[in-house]
């Protein structure tokens, strides 16, 4: 157990992987023009000088390029992954060897995961971060919930709702025993958080509505150059990559059930259809359901689709969308996976506890569950992100969009004073992120004349669309 006065340099799987990681980071930099342009733009200016940034985001090669961008802009950075399976160990090793404290390895336990999250919130001299780069909201949650517990220590005695909560509360007990005001001190120095993903944004808005949010937040997820690119085009490529690396299955001719038709669901459905699958979509939202139908997908309920599907993909950000009863009804050899942020989209804990199923591990992140009737299913990445648990996540180019937004959000929070609330980056920055990625694709923009700009009522150099425009 570490104490608040013992600040560790790093904890990774194997530091000898650093050279391999560095080679891949060098390759990724060429595919991440937005981040590299941001480095050039602010060279010598250090807009993040003095900032202590805690990062809770998948420790991949692409994230390594983000980390080193933040460091070049002047920040002191500590990093952990936001998922127990998503770390690329050679990326973590390279970052650790560069001198950035990183606490991440592929295959963490829940106890280790929350220990790692705690480490990124503990800087030298007993200080906490003043900025967070978050993905899913766990680092933010640790501060907010820790603050709440310090106001009402009886919360430490409540029975945990699940294994995740049990592991988290163990960290809270250790911190509280050392310093009963630790999280109040951390919160007091916080300038803000930039949140990467849909699930984390939902958490932020819920905290705001309840009056629990303690510092400003920028919703990076809903920047157009994030949600319409990372969520859509990234998933379109990385979902199939994860499924195929895990199972070697032929997708063509299969029935794939995609649960949810938001941006992630849209990308996932397109991916599976492109491989020749017949895709069934489930939806709660009539607008998204109509979109799916107009794209030619069958739209049904899970209770009906469960009997037809060969592959099931959850994309909703909600819990219990695939239940234990659903899994018991699936066809023999069905594949079950998730590309939403948390594993509770699938009732994984209920499956673990079910005496009528036997588990056989096929290989890392691929488990076969056989039920009493002889049918089996394959659960990928224990219900966590299949594209990162079973493959390497989204390609570098699309992550450059997202991470350029993250970098700009960190600069925005550090250099300006925001009131507590949830904000989005301005439209002109969204357009700038897109512009930084055009040259690499050989794109040539048409330019308005003065008369044309005046005619449609937009500035000559943008922004070209109103805030309410839906791309």
Swiss-Prot record:
Query: Which NCBIfam families did the record assign?
Result: ahcY (TIGR00936), PRK05476.2-3 (NF004005)
Its Gene Ontology cellular component terms are: cytosol
GO molecular-function term, one example from the UniProt record: adenosylhomocysteinase activity
What Gene3D superfamilies does this protein map onto? Adenosylhomocysteinase-like, NAD(P)-binding Rossmann-like Domain
Places the protein is found: Cytoplasm
Residues noted as binding substrate in the record, renumbered to the chain: 60, 135, 196, 226, 230
Instruction: Give the family from UniProt.
Output: Belongs to the adenosylhomocysteinase family.
Annotated pathway: Amino-acid biosynthesis; L-homocysteine biosynthesis; L-homocysteine from S-adenosyl-L-homocysteine: step 1/1
Chief subcellular location equals cytoplasm
Which SMART domains does the protein's record reference?
AdoHcyase (SM00996), AdoHcyase_NAD (SM00997)
Which E.C. number(s) belong to this protein?
Answer: 3.13.2.1
The coenzyme or cofactor needed here is: NAD(+)
State the reactions this protein catalyses. Answer: S-adenosyl-L-homocysteine + H2O = L-homocysteine + adenosine
Name listed for the protein in its UniProt record:
Adenosylhomocysteinase
Write down how the cofactor binds this protein: Binds 1 NAD(+) per subunit.
**Which GO BP terms, alphabetically?**
L-homocysteine biosynthetic process; one-carbon metabolic process; S-adenosylmethionine cycle
Which keywords label this protein? Cytoplasm, Hydrolase, NAD, One-carbon metabolism
Q: HAMAP family under this entry?
A: AdoHcyase
The organism is Pelodictyon phaeoclathratiforme (strain DSM 5477 / BU-1)
InterPro entries per UniProt: Adenosylhomocyst_ase-like_sf, Adenosylhomocysteinase-like, Ado_hCys_hydrolase_NAD-bd, NAD(P)-bd_dom_sf, S-Ado-L-homoCys_hydrolase_CS
Name the residues that bind NAD(+): 197-199, 231, 260-265, 283, 318, 339-341, 387
NAD recorded as keyword: yes
The enzyme's main class, written as a single word, is hydrolase
**Gene name in the database record:** ahcY
Per the entry, what this protein does is:
May play a key role in the regulation of the intracellular concentration of adenosylhomocysteine.
One Pfam family name is AdoHcyase_NAD
């Amino acid at each position: 157990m570490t104490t608040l006065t013992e600040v560790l340099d790093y904890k990774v799987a194997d530091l000898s992987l650093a050279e391999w990681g560095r080679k891949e980071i060098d390759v990724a930099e060429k595919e991440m023009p937005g981040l590299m342009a941001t480095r050039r733009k602010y060279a010598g200016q250090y807009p993040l000088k003095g900032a202590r940034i805690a990062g809770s985001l998948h420790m991949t090669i692409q994230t390594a390029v983000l980390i080193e961008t933040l460091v070049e802009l002047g920040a002191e950075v500590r990093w952990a992954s936001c998922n127990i399976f998503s770390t690329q160990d050679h990326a973590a090793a390279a970052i650790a060897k560069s001198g950035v404290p990183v606490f991440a390895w592929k295959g963490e336990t829940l106890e280790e995961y929350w220990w790692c999250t705690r480490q990124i919130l503990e800087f030298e001299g007993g200080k906490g971060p003043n900025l967070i780069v978050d993905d899913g909201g766990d680092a933010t949650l640790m501060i907010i919930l820790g603050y709440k517990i310090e106001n009402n220590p009886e919360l430490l005695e409540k029975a945990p709702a699940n294994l995740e909560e049990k592991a988290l509360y163990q960290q809270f007990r250790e911190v509280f025993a050392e310093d009963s005001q630790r999280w109040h001190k951390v919160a007091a120095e916080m300038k803000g958080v930039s949140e990467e993903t849909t699930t984390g944004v939902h958490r932020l808005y819920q905290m705001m509505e309840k009056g629990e949010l303690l510092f400003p937040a920028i919703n990076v997820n809903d920047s157009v150059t994030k949600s319409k690119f990372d969520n859509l085009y990234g998933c379109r490529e990385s979902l199939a990559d994860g499924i195929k690396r895990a199972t070697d299955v032929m997708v063509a001719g299969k029935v794939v059930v995609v649960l949810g038709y938001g941006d992630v669901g849209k990308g996932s459905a397109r991916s599976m259809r492109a491989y020749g699958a017949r895709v069934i979509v489930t939806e709660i939202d009539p607008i998204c359901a109509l979109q799916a139908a107009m794209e030619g997908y069958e739209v049904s309920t899970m209770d009906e689709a469960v009997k037809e599907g060969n592959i099931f993909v959850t994309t909703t950000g909600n819990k219990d969308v695939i239940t234990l009863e659903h899994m018991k009804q699936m066809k023999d050899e069905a594949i079950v996976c998730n590309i939403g942020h948390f594993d509770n989209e699938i009732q994984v804990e209920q499956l673990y506890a079910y005496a009528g199923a036997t588990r056989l591990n096929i290989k890392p992140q691929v488990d076969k569950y056989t039920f009493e009737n002889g049918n089996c299913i394959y659960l990928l990445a224990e219900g966590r992100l299949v594209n990162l648990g079973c493959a390497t996540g989204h390609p570098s180019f699309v992550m450059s969009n997202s991470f350029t937004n993250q970098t700009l959000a960190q600069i925005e929070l550090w250099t300006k004073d925001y009131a507590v609330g949830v904000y989005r980056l301005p439209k002109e920055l969204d357009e700038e992120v897109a512009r930084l990625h055009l040259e690499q694709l050989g794109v040539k923009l048409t330019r308005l004349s003065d008369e044309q700009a005046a005619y449609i009522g937009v500035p000559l150099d943008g922004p070209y669309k109103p805030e309410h425009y839906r791309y």
